[in-house]
Amino acid sequence: MEANEERCILLKYPHPSSDISSEYLLLELDDDLLKTLEENPEEEIVFKSDFDKKASVLCTSDKTYAVRQVVQSNSYLLFDELSPTDWVLNDTCYSFLEVERIYGFIFSDDKISYWDEDSVELKPISLTKDQFIRSVPASRNEVDSFLQKNFFMVKNEFLYRLSPSYICSIIDWIFVIAQQLHIDFASFEFKILKKPAMDDEFDWDSVICVLESISSPIKDNVLPKKFNIDLELTTFWYGRFLLEGINSISSDEFIQLWDNRLPYPCKGLPSLNLLKGYYFHDTPNTIQYLSGDQLPREPSRRFQSLFQLKSKWLYEELWSFVKDLALSKSRVEALILKYGRKQTSRDGVYINSRGTW
């Protein structure tokens, strides 16, 4: 199955007298997936190719499952009838599909064009939102959440991502206008910025996109809906964009550069804790940018990539780059001990590589 293809099937309980198709697969449902189907019989099930095209994932509207074919030495007997007095053997089956809940893996590659202040005239080519959803091994709701949190917008029916420089210029503008209009960041309506945006020739769709990515709605059931700008989240994005363009830098120097770049309300907030999972210490006193998006999804290749960067990791630092490999903490810890050796010292707990890679 190609990465941009999908096959939708509707799972329904068959009537006992219905014929069993000669083409079938047995699917083992875990409790969570079974509950979903029982509560919503019309739930759409989508099979998609993983990024490496060597495996498939199963997606409901909001969850993603890894799919693995299990081959057995014994067999399942499949009967036409459920009557205990008149069973007719239809076929035997030596394998079934096993599903395991995982995090959807979403990566925005060069198929999604950047949109910036010059794009109004250029009209870059991109994908539609539905095309993008079909191309990534994740559920629709997981993709929707990712797009909203990462500065993506739909423009002229196509999906675009805002460029980092354009994002920062819009955020700088938002904070300047907010100060002029005495806007309370803890509770305000987006529409109050629309006229200033038009006056200053900012694309309103882009402004909304940025606001949605750095703020959260206030859940008070009062209309019109109001939002709260998250200053720590805003600080995070400035730090991430800044570090992404730097090869290696001392931690103290980076914090100073980061703080200098921020709008006034975010001054003093920079901390490396905000960037966990987006940097690693290449030396004890210097850091480099690293994002999970750059790392393979398959566990052995993920650990291989990490241990090729350095053979010894502080446990907490390594955890930030492998925590998405499984939903349960115990499963992640088991993977760490499978591919690494734990070492305890006065400076903390470290994980050393088990292999030469």
Swiss-Prot record:
Disulfide topology? none
Specify the domain of life of the species encoding this protein. Eukaryota
Q: Name one Pfam family in it.
A: Dcc1
Q: Which GO terms describe its molecular function?
A: ATP hydrolysis activity; DNA binding
Answer yes or no on keyword Cell cycle: yes
Is Signal one of the keywords UniProt gives this record? no
Q: Name one GO biological process term.
A: mitotic sister chromatid cohesion
Arranged from A to Z, the UniProt key words for this protein are: Cell cycle, Cytoplasm, DNA replication, DNA-binding, Nucleus
List GO terms (cellular component aspect). Answer: chromatin; chromosome, centromeric region; Ctf18 RFC-like complex; cytosol; nucleus
Q: Matching InterPro entries, A to Z?
A: Dcc1
Q: Where does this polypeptide localize? A: Cytoplasm; Nucleus
Tell me which family the UniProt entry assigns to this protein.
Answer: Belongs to the DCC1 family.
The annotated subunit structure for this chain is: Component of the ctf18-RFC complex which consists of ctf18, ctf8, dcc1, rfc2, rfc3, rfc4 and rfc5.
Its biological purpose is as follows: Essential for the fidelity of chromosome transmission. Required for the DNA replication block checkpoint. Replication factor C (RFC) complex has an essential but redundant activity in sister chromatid cohesion establishment. An RFC-like complex (ctf18-RFC) is formed where ctf18 replaces rfc1 in the RFC complex along with the association of dcc1 and ctf8. This complex is required for efficient establishment of chromosome cohesion during S-phase. Acts as a PCNA loader, loading PCNA onto primed templates.
Question: PANTHER family, alphabetically?
Answer: SISTER CHROMATID COHESION PROTEIN DCC1, SISTER CHROMATID COHESION PROTEIN DCC1-RELATED
> Could you identify this protein by its name?
Sister chromatid cohesion protein dcc1
Which organism's genome codes for this protein? Answer: Schizosaccharomyces pombe (strain 972 / ATCC 24843) (Fission yeast)
